[in-house]
Amino acid sequence: MSLLRTLQMQPRVITVFAEHANVGAASEILGALKTASGPKCKVQVSTMFPTLEQLIYMSEINRTAVAAQVPRLSELLQKPSFSEEFSSPLAQCTQDGVWRSQGGLWVDWEKRLLGADGQSVHELLGSSTMTID
């Protein structure tokens, strides 16, 4: 099987960034993803703050949603990629005022879609089924 064929068979990845998967917006997002993402989607839950590269990409997709969840977004986008905030546990980022408690963000990396609640999942992804990791 060729590499291209192998890649075509891989599910699309949707990442949910949340301090706790079963609390607040994250719970709502995961519930919506169960019914709204396609069968070729794989949902990953990350309890770590995005890397600088991920944060830049996410803010290019929907800066308003990212800024609502990441209060110091403009400041963080100016920091070097090795700054301690990047890839730190979200629990620590909440204590440091970098991440809002009870919140969450979901990102469909391939389709360039991003939201902060269950409603955005339904509006942007429609409905079908998927797998959650």
Swiss-Prot record:
It comes from the Eukaryota. The keyword Mitochondrion applies. It is an enzyme of class 1 (oxidoreductase). InterPro entries: Fmp46, Thioredoxin-like_sf. Keywords: Mitochondrion, Oxidoreductase, Transit peptide. It is found in: Mitochondrion. Its EC number is 1.-.-.-. Pfam families: DUF1687. One of its GO terms (molecular function) is oxidoreductase activity. Residues 1-21 form a transit peptide. GO terms for cellular component: mitochondrion. The keyword Oxidoreductase applies. The active site is at C93. Putative mitochondrial redox protein which could be involved in the reduction of small toxic molecules. Belongs to the FMP46 family. This is Putative redox protein FMP46, mitochondrial. It comes from Eremothecium gossypii (strain ATCC 10895 / CBS 109.51 / FGSC 9923 / NRRL Y-1056).
